[in-house]
């Protein structure tokens, strides 16, 4: 009897066990689609990025005009550039939905998968930040200046650290060159860590909406979830192309159409929409070091989620108290995102401070307490 090459060949066997014969819970909903969508985003961003790198010049005298050259003179350069810029926005939409799913359904109890995922988020944020500097527009330059300057809040070594990252006494040619190097390198690091993320996931298998063990009811990944993922991919690409072809600059900043000028500060310095919530938390604390710590903690708090889980049940599906807190957290993050894009004046300052306090209160205090109360209600 001839054996199936798919199951015996050393390389094909890995692919088979990961994407074809993988036993999957039969009841995972569309919320489980975002992992594969993130993989698709990563591939798309890498391909468009490599094509952009072929025509881009990482030099302060050429960067801005090389991006203009790409959009005007390169065959389909406008499409590649706009897909790359809007692909980043879609990437973060998928990341946030993926994390939200993990929080809601208690996926963070797979600690290794969760920790590699949170590290992937940090790497992706770093990649997006250095990438935003590359077109060398006003917001690129001042964004780089403001965010790298935050490191000067580090006691004793702060200023040295900032100058070391800048490669001089201000954001200059050395900074742009190294940011381009990092922007090219980091996605490959992300790919490697994505494989580790999947490796850890396949050690335990996927979680499911009930949070119960699903070993008794598994179905093969292909054809069921491969086609389901394909549908998700088609919908995501439709959204990306709609955004790219009809309103490519909707999510961008008009200031970035002005070449970088160290002598003129834009009226409102703000990052891309996907960083606004963290930027709002940073700005809500009057002390520089305090702001930086709050900014870092707002992301690093994700590492604490497995420790903060107090409930006997895994998912939020059957826990009304935690559900109210979860959706309050989402609403609060939307408020923070809105505040991050507003000028630093009242009432925005006060709203930002209240939303920042609420953000940490829900995650660190209220959710663990709600879990304990629900446990009491069960007994």
Curated annotation (Swiss-Prot):
Keywords: Electron transport, Heme, Iron, Membrane, Metal-binding, Mitochondrion, Mitochondrion inner membrane, Respiratory chain, Transmembrane, Transmembrane helix, Transport, Ubiquinone. Gene3D superfamilies: Cytochrome Bc1 Complex, Chain C (1.20.810.10). The chain crosses the membrane at residues 34-54, 78-99, 114-134, 179-199, 227-247, 289-309, 321-341, 348-368. InterPro entries: Cyt_b/b6_C (IPR005798), Cyt_b/b6_C_sf (IPR036150), Cyt_b/b6_N (IPR005797), Cytb/b6-like_sf (IPR027387), Cytochrome_b (IPR030689), Cytochrome_b_C_euk/bac (IPR048260), Cytochrome_b_N_euk/bac (IPR048259), Di-haem_cyt_TM (IPR016174). GO terms for biological process: mitochondrial electron transport, ubiquinol to cytochrome c. Binds 2 heme b groups non-covalently. GO terms for cellular component: mitochondrial inner membrane; respiratory chain complex III. It is a multi-pass membrane protein. Heme b b566 binds at residues 98, 197. The keyword Phosphoprotein does not apply. One of its GO terms (molecular function) is ubiquinol-cytochrome-c reductase activity. Coiled coil: none annotated. It holds the Pfam family Cytochrom_B_C. A ubiquinone binds at residue 202. Its cofactor is heme b. PANTHER family: CYTOCHROME B. The cytochrome bc1 complex contains 3 respiratory subunits (MT-CYB, CYC1 and UQCRFS1), 2 core proteins (UQCRC1 and UQCRC2) and probably 6 low-molecular weight proteins. Belongs to the cytochrome b family. Component of the ubiquinol-cytochrome c reductase complex (complex III or cytochrome b-c1 complex) that is part of the mitochondrial respiratory chain. The b-c1 complex mediates electron transfer from ubiquinol to cytochrome c. Contributes to the generation of a proton gradient across the mitochondrial membrane that is then used for ATP synthesis. This is Cytochrome b. The gene is MT-CYB.
């Amino acid at each position: 009897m001839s054996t199936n090459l798919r199951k015996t060949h050393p390389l094909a066997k890995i692919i088979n066990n990961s994407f074809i014969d993988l036993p999957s819970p039969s009841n995972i909903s569309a919320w489980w689609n975002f992992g594969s969508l993130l993989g698709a985003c990563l591939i798309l961003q890498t391909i468009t990025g490599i094509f952009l790198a072929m025509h881009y010049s990482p030099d302060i005298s050429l960067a801005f005009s090389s991006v203009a050259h790409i959009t005007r003179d390169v065959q389909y350069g406008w499409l590649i550039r706009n897909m790359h810029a809007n692909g980043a926005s879609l990437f973060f939409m998928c990341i946030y939905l993926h994390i939200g799913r993990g929080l809601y359904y208690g996926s963070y109890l797979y600690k290794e998968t969760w920790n590699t995922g949170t590290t992937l988020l940090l790497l992706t944020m770093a990649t997006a930040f250095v990438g935003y500097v590359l077109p060398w527009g006003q917001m690129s330059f001042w964004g780089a200046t403001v965010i790298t300057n935050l490191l000067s809040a580090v006691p004793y070594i702060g200023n040295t650290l900032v100058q070391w990252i800048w490669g001089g006494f201000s954001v200059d040619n050395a900074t742009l060159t190294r940011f381009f190097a990092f922007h090219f390198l980091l996605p490959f690091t992300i790919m490697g860590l994505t494989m580790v993320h999947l490796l850890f996931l396949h050690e335990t298998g996927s979680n499911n909406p009930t949070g119960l063990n699903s070993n008794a009811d598994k179905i093969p990944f292909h054809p069921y979830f491969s086609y389901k993922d394909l549908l998700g991919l088609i919908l995501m690409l439709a959204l990306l192309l709609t955004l790219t072809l009809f309103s490519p600059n909707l999510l961008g900043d008009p200031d970035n159409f002005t070449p970088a000028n160290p002598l003129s500060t834009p009226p409102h310095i703000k990052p891309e929409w996907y960083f606004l919530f963290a930027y709002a938390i940073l700005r809500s604390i009057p002390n520089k070091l305090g702001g930086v710590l709050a900014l870092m903690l707002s992301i690093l708090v994700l590492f604490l989620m497995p420790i903060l889980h107090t409930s006997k049940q895994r998912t939020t599906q059957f826990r009304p108290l935690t559900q109210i807190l979860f959706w309050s957290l989402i609403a609060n993050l939307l408020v923070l995102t809105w505040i991050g894009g507003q000028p630093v004046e009242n009432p925005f300052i006060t709203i930002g401070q209240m939303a920042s306090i609420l953000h940490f209160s829900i995650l660190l205090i209220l959710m663990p307490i709600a879990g304990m109360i629900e446990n009491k209600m069960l007994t």
